[in-house]
Amino acid sequence: CTIHSNSVIGSDGFGFAPQENEEFITIPQIGNVIIKDNVSIGSNTVIDKATIESTIINKGVKLDNLIQIGHNVEIGKNTVIAAQSGISGSTKVGKNSMLGGQVGVVGHLKLGNFSKYAAQAGVSKNTKNNQTVIGSPAMPKDQFIKSYIIFKKLPSIVRQIEELEKKLSNLQAK
């Protein structure tokens, strides 16, 4: 394994419980981090220890610089994650997946094996095996492309509607 400078392995996870007095108390993080063979961890990457059990980085995982891995997360084998990505607590990332730069994943999700997450995807739902998602909120690639094409046409559609409204108004005035 290779761990580059300024990385933190085993920091406390972000665990706090609200109290009746509107303050928060720290939930003890007493778990650990397991890093398997042939893992590369880039500079300034943080991997939080689990609350009770283990945060697991499986064999062959490659983590770029500036990544946050939350408590209880498991990264599947041979998965690669680009810089400035964050994976919130208790998420399971499938094997042989690719996360582009600045991907954000909310907690407690299950991400499919052999899946791809485009740069800046905001993943808020479970994903299937072999799925490619894009956007924020993240959606399947084909759905995103259709939505994007329509989005680009919106100014023209609005102009057409305004012209039709004028014509209708003129007809009603007669």
Regions found by a protein language model. Give the residues of each.
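Long, leucine- and charge-enriched amphipathic alpha-helices
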Residues: 139-174
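Structural signal for interior beta-strand "rungs" in well-ordered beta-sheet cores
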Residues: 1-140
